[in-house]
Amino acid sequence: MIAIWKSDIMAKGLKKIGEDMKKKQKSIKINLIMNTIKTLMSLIFPLITFPYASRILGATGIGRVNYASSIVSYFSMFAALGISTYAVREGARIRDDKEKFSKFSREMLNINLCTTFIAYCALAVFLALPILENYKKLLVISSLSIIFTTIGTEWIFTIKEEYAYITKRAILFQIISLILLFVLVKNKNDYYWYAALTVISSGGSAFFNLWHSRKIVDWKQKKERLEYRKHLKPILMIFGTSVASSIYMTMDTTMLGAFRGDKATGVYTAAVKINTIVSTLIGTISATILPRVSYYLGNNLKKEYEKLMKESVDILFMIAIPAAIGMICTSDILILIFSGKEFLTGSTAAKILSA
């Protein structure tokens, strides 16, 4: 009887483990689907907005906005400081403990607010340079994205794998931005409105996130001592490894704007936009699995980790290679459809970026 009772308990335990594993696999699939929908919308959105904006504003207007954005991106990079990546990696390990997770989230936000303040101080000094006199208003508008990204704490929802919420919110503000684009951008002088619309989505998302995060994180400061020092070294290490790639992604636009002017920057932007659409789709896979990878490693689930990594690499190769070949073969047609004849000289850059 005892043996039967023990075997029954073991059977129930194994059944529960099996059910938990199925739920985890299902949640990964749902997360991937929701994140794919979000990514597809972020791909479709510029396919509608950029062709319209490029034809209304022309290469010069687009170039002015993107030159200003490229300058602001350096200050955004410092404000971010690798905090988001670190928060996702470490926060995923303690996400089931609300008290620890809330304390961790307060520490991350406070560090991020400090780096954001320093970034704005540096930007204020930078704006005094005479060479940027004609770009001051655009730089101020674009710089709003820095504080919006900080207070948005997107990493909280990535850690919690709330991709349904992230997707719905993103689609909502993309639709709002699209409507405002058609209403406000009517001629070549409306590039200030176009610059503002590029940050409206992040601004709205930030306030939504602040409201929604109260269900997940207890933001009230407790009597316990917040630990900042232990986070600084790993955050700076991540920042050090990411700074090179971040500069690589934006230095080309900044240098082009400084040496060749707004029109050349606008033409090059069309090539970059097309390349970004494809690379964003590929990057979705990595962004989706990162919280689960951290969770598996944090709980010493090596088999699940290895299986997930193998599947992810297979999918990446399956998408990346055909995408690169397709981009090289069709860049002329894509530039013409996507941006118009004025941007057609950017097709060579599109081919090089796709390789």
Q: What does each model-found stretch correspond to?
A:
Residues F50-P51, A80-D96, A271, T276-V313, ...:
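Helix-loop junctions and terminal segments of transmembrane helices
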Residues I147-A170, S347, I352-A355:
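Membrane-interface junctions at transmembrane-helix termini in multi-pass inner-membrane proteins
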Residues I44-I62, V183-K188, S246-I277, P291-Y296, ...:
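Helix-terminus/linker motif at the lipid-water interface of multi-pass membrane proteins
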Residues Y52, G63-A80, M237, D252-T254, ...:
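Alpha-helical transmembrane segments of polytopic membrane transporters and translocases
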Residues L40, L47, M77-A80, T85, ...:
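Alpha-helical transmembrane segments of multi-pass membrane transport and lipid-handling proteins
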Residues Y67, S143, T167-K215, P234, ...:
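Hydrophobic alpha-helical transmembrane segments
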Residues K26-S84, L178, T198, L236-F259:
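Signature of the first transmembrane helix
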